[in-house]
Swiss-Prot record:
Zn(2+) binds at H481, H485, E504. Binds 1 zinc ion per subunit. GO terms for molecular function: metalloaminopeptidase activity; zinc ion binding. Expressed in testis, heart, brain, lung, liver, skeletal muscle, kidney and ovary. Expressed in vascular tissues. Its EC number is 3.4.11.-. Belongs to the peptidase M1 family. This is Aminopeptidase O. GO terms for cellular component: cytoplasm; nucleolus. It is found in: Nucleus, Nucleolus. InterPro entries: Aminopeptidase_N-like_N_sf, AOPep, ARM-type_fold, M1_LTA-4_hydro/amino_C_sf, Peptidase_M1_C, Peptidase_M1_dom, Peptidase_M4/M1_CTD_sf. It comes from Mus musculus.
Length: 823
């Protein structure tokens, strides 16, 4: 595989050789250093067999040696320079993780609050000495490859798990007969195979093993995308250490986390959904097939709150004065890309008033939990873990425990727009899909540099502050979208990341269903709202397809190669590093329209009970498009399939660019007979066009035009249609602003308003464009392009001025796209 890819334009490489070894559990022990903008410490990885290792014969294991030939050169395992520990500063509350863990002969590499001495020499692998291995009698050593980027790796060592007392009752390892190497491998092999009902004991064993001493440094090398590890004389994965410890620290420029300030000006750091995921936060196996559990202990100054995607609601443990330790864990195996962390001066927001009674009323669409979930047996098809789908109490829990965190300055906005919505949105999701896959939920309002409206991880959702403006409409729909990801994107993941529609298409389709249910809309009103939103998305999809290359319009770009990996397990994500991809919505929109087409074709009474059944059968697993489509059609009598087949759906919707024929026909029919809400908007547009044609000086006493009250979605559609007008006078724009109170509307409405302001150079509202670029960065990227193509010096200066103010904290992809627009 070519690993010298252009990091700004090419496909994203997934380098880990998961076919040979799979990480089963991570234990992270980290310190957050805001002064130097680094996270440092160590991570212990526990391995099981790879995807194809169990089926291999001795002859096929020769491929391991062939795949290792690319790594002739390794650095000599050099001891880290470590400062002596002042015993007077040791705190017994820290546990014996603070004791000697750097390997034989080394002293503790941490000072009293867990940080590496900042004066020590940084033994980065990129500046290390190299040598060739000659100690394996001509055989190549097996090479463990981890995904890694922008990390300073100080040392890698094998962990002596055999030195941990008390593991005998959990393992079958024959201590008397086994060699030390064999014994260590057997202990870990037994540990990762413990049954789900022993998860507490398993986590405790993992913790104690992670604190065991090292028993020999391993040789390491790296390139731009990976960390490569080997042990001299070990030629197959079966003989490679099953538990290794990596000492490392992140770099301030690493793209996995963003170091910035919150809305109160306080420092914070969080995972912001980088294209490279978490490989600049910790060495890991990125391919989604590498599903693992994890534990993490994170230390930070006492003024900070540490939130993570763990299943427990962690409480801080005091360390020495001024520092706290936070511990999280998960027992459901998931890809490393789902790991999330946010450290900042967040305040928990608690509702001051109960939500309206009508939003808390229980009801069902289309089946109640008792009717639906009991139709399926309690067996699960995923790897063993403590699963909520097997719990009767979890199945009936429509509202899981939740918390909301934000900078204190946003408390009022959270009270008005968010807190009262959460119970109804959670209940609505449960009424549609059944059991919540995760036991709790934290919601964090992230800093202004967050590049999207929301991001879901297990047990935690990041929301942009842009969702808190205007009415509750944008906040509610976005919250429903992110909640939908609990099922599609997290509990059920795509086996091939290029099939992004399996996550985003489903969440976009379900957000409308959840939101209508949360609002308690009668069926006819829910249908009208959904038709209006389909109209808006149709306009957006047309714009996307006009302005994107054909290769990025395909939902299944790898076609028959989808899901395939190399012999080692490595692969690439097509267009994964293209900075423009993060701002495209083709996978959201085409995926949404496919699911809408299937729902309308088959009927809601068939589709949604099927979807609930699909979730029950496939949670905890990775899927491809055909898994969903095949099960859908298998659950429909042949005489009701209306000519649908997996082959024609894949051909017409997933593997073609442009607009599918079925969608063109549907929208053509909609244009001929628009929905009531769209017709109402059309009438209002006609009024505004007449107003715009009036002479500037009107006679006194002329009757004012009466405009209808419109919903936020209707205002967006109105502004989109008005954008098609060649000219709008300043008087018309002023009247438009006053009529709909546009500066106070939600971010979707204000975005369209800013487009009108720029197009017609309405100078009185330039300050609103500037405010949008500074405060609504999740949606403002497109406006920079509009400002520059306006060819108006004042507008172009506004663009440059705003970019100068925000570029330091803007994520790299956003900054790159804006730079190309401006320069």
């Amino acid at each position: 595989m070519d690993i010298k890819l252009d990091p700004s334009r090419d496909d994203l490489p997934l380098m880990a050789n998961t076919s040979h070894m799979l990480v089963k559990h991570y234990i992270l022990d980290l310190d957050v250093d805001f002064g130097n903008q680094v996270i440092e410490g160590n991570i212990v990885l526990f391995f099981g067999d790879g995807n194809r290792f169990k089926n291999q014969s001795r002859s096929t294991q020769e491929t391991f040696q062939m795949e290792s030939e690319e790594a002739d050169i390794f650095r000599t395992a050099e001891p880290c320079h470590v400062p002596e520990m002042d015993s007077s500063t040791f705190s017994p509350k820290m546990g014996h993780r603070e004791c000697a863990v750097c390997g034989k002969g080394d002293q503790d590499a941490f000072d009293n609050d867990g940080n590496h001495d900042n004066q020590e020499r940084d033994s980065e692998i990129s500046s290390s000495k190299y040598c060739c291995d000659t100690g394996n009698h001509g055989k190549r050593d097996f090479l463990l490859v981890l995904d890694c980027c922008d990390l300073s790796v100080l040392k890698v060592e094998e962990v002596d798990v055999a030195a941990v007392p008390g593991l005998e009752k959990f393992t079958k390892a024959p201590k008397l007969l086994a060699t030390p190497e064999k014994l260590r491998c057997e202990i870990v092999r037994d540990l990762v195979a413990l049954p789900a009902d022993a998860w507490r004991e398993q986590l405790d064993c993992y913790t104690r093993c992670s604190q065991a001493p090292g028993c020999g440094e391993l040789l390491i090398d790296s390139d731009n995308w990976s960390l490569r590890i080997r042990k001299t004389g070990t030629s197959t994965p079966a003989d490679f250490p099953r538990a290794i410890r990596i000492w490392y620290k992140t770099k301030p420029e690493g793209q996995s986390v963003a170091w910035t300030t919150d809305q109160n000006g306080r420092p914070c750091v969080y995972t912001m959904g980088s294209p490279i995921n978490n490989r600049a936060l910790f060495p890991c196996q990125e391919p989604p097939v590498a599903m693992s559990t994890w534990q993490a202990t994170v230390r930070a100054a006492a003024s900070f709150v540490v939130l993570m995607s763990g299943e427990n609601s962690a409480k801080p443990t005091p360390l020495r004065e001024g520092y706290m330790s936070w511990h999280y864990y998960v027992t459901m195996p998931m890809p490393a890309s789902t790991f999330a962390i946010a450290v900042g001066c967040w305040t928990e927001m608690k509702p001051k008033a109960s939500p309206p009674d009508d939003l808390m009323t229980e009801h069902s669409l289309p089946l109640s939990p008792s009717e639906a979930d009991l139709r399926y047996d309690n067996t699960c098809n995923h790897m063993e873990y403590p699963c909520r789908f097997q719990s009767a109490s979890a199945a009936s829990q429509d509202i899981i425990p939740y918390r909301v965190f934000a900078p204190v300055c946003l408390e009022g906005a959270c009270q008005e727009a968010l807190l009262w919505l959460i119970p109804s949105c959670l209940s609505a999701a449960h009424s549609v899909l059944g059991t919540h896959p995760f036991s709790r939920l934290d919601i964090l309002i992230v800093p202004t540099n967050f590049p999207s409206l929301g991001m879901a991880s297990p047990h935690i959702i990041f929301l942009s502050q842009s969702t808190l403006t205007g009415t509750s409409h944008l906040c509610g729909t976005r919250l429903c979208h992110e909640i939908a990801h609990s099922w599609f994107g997290l509990a059920i993941g795509a086996r091939d990341w290029t099939e992004e529609w399996l996550s985003e298409g489903f969440a976009t389709h379900l957000e409308d269903i959840f939101w209508a249910e949360a609002q308690q809309l009668p069926p006819h009103e829910a249908l009208e709202q959904q038709e209006l939103r389909a109209c808006l998305r149709w306009h957006r999809l047309q714009d996307e397809l006009r302005n994107s290359p054909e290769g990025m319009q395909v939902l299944r770009p790898n076609k028959e190669e989808t899901g395939h990996v190399s012999a080692s397990g490595a692969s690439v994500v097509k267009h994964g590093l293209n900075p423009e991809k993060g701002f495209m919505q083709v996978h959201y929109l085409k995926g949404y329209f496919l699911l809408r087409f299937l729902t309308r074709t088959l009927g809601e009474k068939i589709y949604f009970p099927f979807l609930r059944k699909f979730v029950h059968l496939f949670h905890g697993q990775l899927i491809l498009s055909q898994d969903f489509l095949q099960m859908l059609l298998e659950n429909i009598p042949e005489n009701k399939r209306l000519g649908l087949s997996v082959e024609n759906i894949v051909r017409d919707w997933l593997e073609c660019s442009g607009i599918p024929k079925a969608l063109q026909e549907e929208r053509k029919a909609e244009d001929c007979s628009p929905s009531r809400l769209a017709r109402q908007v059309g009438s209002e547009v006609a009024k505004w066009i007449r107003v715009n044609r009036r002479p500037r000086k009107r006679k006194r006493g002329k009757r004012e035009v009466a405009f209808e009250k419109l919903s936020p979605d209707q205002i967006v559609l109105l502004l989109e249609w008005l954008l098609e007008q060649k000219t709008l006078s300043p008087q018309t724009l002023h009247c438009l602003q006053q009529t709909y109170h546009l500066p106070e509307q939600d971010a979707e409405v204000r975005h369209r308003w800013c487009e009108l302001v720029i197009k017609h150079k309405y100078t009185k509202a330039y300050n609103q464009v500037e405010r949008f670029l500074l405060e609504d960065q999740a949606m403002g990227i497109y406006l920079y392009g509009e400002l520059m193509v306006s060819e108006d010096a004042r507008l172009q200066q506004l663009a440059h001025r705003c970019f100068e103010l925000v570029k330091e904290h803007m994520d790299r992809a956003s900054a790159q796209v804006v730079t190309e627009m401006l320069f």
